[in-house]
């Protein structure tokens, strides 16, 4: 807001443009997926497969899915519940960010797309960011698989 920055990378697309608009500043988002970056999962739960309780993790992921469905299906009620947890959330910025976050939720958070992970690894190799791809089983597991 100080006018000292022309661009940022890694900003939260649901907050920064809303904050700028509230402050009367114009902004534009460059969507990474429109600039050649393959689609990737932004929120990944991490657990040690050697020590995790698979049943607990499965139930947690299922609860996440049910909560996501409730939020999407009941945006006003879910906003009231969320914003009711802390007074500092009850402002225009957070209300706008909530609205802009809803379409970004994965309706099936447990879904595991092997191809997406392999495509992103290939992108990282081709960009010189990693030296080689790894077997998908060494970097992620499908917690819903038996």
Per-range role (PLM):
Residues 2-85:
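Pocket-lining segment of extracytoplasmic ligand-binding domains
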Residues 53-129:
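Secondary-structure end/capping motifs
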Residues 121-146:
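Conserved C-terminal helix/tail region of periplasmic/extracytoplasmic solute-binding proteins
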């Amino acid at each position: 807001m100080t006018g000292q920055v022309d661009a940022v990378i890694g900003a939260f697309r649901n907050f920064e443009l809303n904050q700028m608009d509230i402050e009367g500043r114009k902004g534009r988002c460059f969507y990474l997926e429109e600039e050649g970056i393959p689609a990737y999962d932004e929120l990944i739960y991490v657990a040690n497969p050697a020590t995790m309780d698979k049943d607990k993790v499965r139930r947690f992921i299922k609860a996440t899915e049910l909560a996501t469905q409730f939020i999407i299906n009941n945006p006003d009620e879910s906003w009231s519940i969320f914003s009711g947890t802390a007074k500092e959330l009850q402002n225009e910025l957070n209300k706008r960010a909530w609205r802009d976050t809803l379409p970004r939720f994965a309706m099936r958070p447990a879904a595991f797309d092997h191809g997406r992970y392999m495509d992103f690894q290939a992108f990282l190799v081709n960009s010189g960011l990693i030296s080689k791809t790894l077997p998908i089983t060494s970097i992620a597991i499908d917690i819903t698989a038996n």
